[in-house]
Amino acid sequence: MAMNVLQSPSRPGLGKVSGFFWRNPGLGLFLLLLGPLMWFGIVYFGSLLTLLWQGFYTFDDFTMSVTPELTLANIRALFNPANYDIIVRTLTMAGAVTIASVILAFPMAWYMARYTSGKMKAFFYIAVMLPMWASYIVKAYAWTLLLAKDGVAQWFLHHLGLEPLLTAFLTLPAVGGNTLSTSGLGRFLVFLYIWLPFMILPVQAALERLPPSLLQASADLGARPRQTFRYVVLPLAIPGIAAGSIFTFSLTLGDFIVPQLVGPPGYFIGNMVYSQQGAIGNMPMAAAFTLVPIVLIALYLAFVKRLGAFDAL
C-alpha cells in the first residue's frame, strides 16, 4: 500500500535568512543580545549616570531648590570631618562584618563540603538559606526585639550569670550603648546574621571543589594538619572567600535600614543618602554620597578579582 508523505512547502526566504545568520554568527549573537544590552545600558547605567551627574549640581540652602549649575562643592563636602566620619564608620563596619563572616563561615562550609552528603547536606543547605527566605525588614525588626532591654538576649545572659559582663562591655565607648539594641555590638550582630549566608555558600562551593587526593598527598608527605590548611586548603579556598566578601562588604556598605533600627546614633552612608534626598531634598549631596560606595566597591572588586573571586561565583 502506497503511503503519501505530506511535505511542508519550502520557504526560500526563510532559508536565505537562516543561511545568512549561519554564515555570520557574530551578527546573530549581537542581535540576540541587543535587547538585554539596551535595557541594561539605558535603564541601569542611564539612571545611574543621571543620578551621579546631579552630584555636580548646585543646591540652594535658602530656597531649598536644585539648580543645574555645575560645581565641585558637593564632592569637596564629602571630606568635611562630619561626612568623613560617616564614610569611615561605614567602611569599618563593612570590613568588620566581612572578617567575622569569614571566621564563622569557614568551619561550617568545611563541614558541609567534607563531612555531609545526601539528606544531611540538603538539611544544611536549607538551614543556611532559610533566613534568606524571610523579609529583610522583618528580620531587622525581630532583632530589635531580641536585643532590647529585658529581651531574649538579656534574659539568656542573665540566666547564664553573664549579665555583669554584658553591662561592663556596654560601657565601652566604641561598641557599647544603653542596651544591646542601641549598641554598636548589636548593630554588628544584626549585620553578621543577615549577610552570613552570602559568605557560607561561596566558601562551601570552593571547598567542594577541593580534591581529596590533595589532602591525602599532603598527609602522605608528612605535612601536619596546620600546614595542610595553610599551604593547601586556604589557597584554594581564597577565591570562594573573596567571592563571598563581595556580597558581605558591598551589602553592608550600602545598607541603611539596620543602622536606622539598631545601634547608637550616627549616620551610615545609606542613611545619609536617604536623609539628604528624602528629608532635606538635597539631591546633589545625596548623589555625591552615592558616589562613595560606588568607588569603594569598584576598588574592592578590582582587588578581589586578583584573588580569583569572579571564577568562584
PLM region spans:
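Transmembrane alpha-helices
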Residues: 34-44, 130, 193, 199-213, ...
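Cytoplasmic-entry segments and transmembrane alpha-helices of multi-pass inner-membrane transporters
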Residues: 108-143, 215-216, 229, 238
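Non-cytoplasmic
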Residues: 51-54, 60, 195-200, 240-274
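N-terminal signal-anchor/first transmembrane alpha helix
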Residues: 2-53, 121-127
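Interhelical loop and adjacent transmembrane-helix boundary motif
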Residues: 9-11, 23-28, 55, 60-62, ...
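Transmembrane alpha-helix signature in integral membrane proteins
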Residues: 81-112
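C-terminal transmembrane helix and the adjacent membrane-cytosol boundary/short C-terminal tail
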Residues: 2-13, 20, 57, 204-215, ...
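Membrane-interfacial helix termini and adjacent extracytoplasmic/periplasmic loops
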Residues: 18-22, 140-192, 226, 263-264
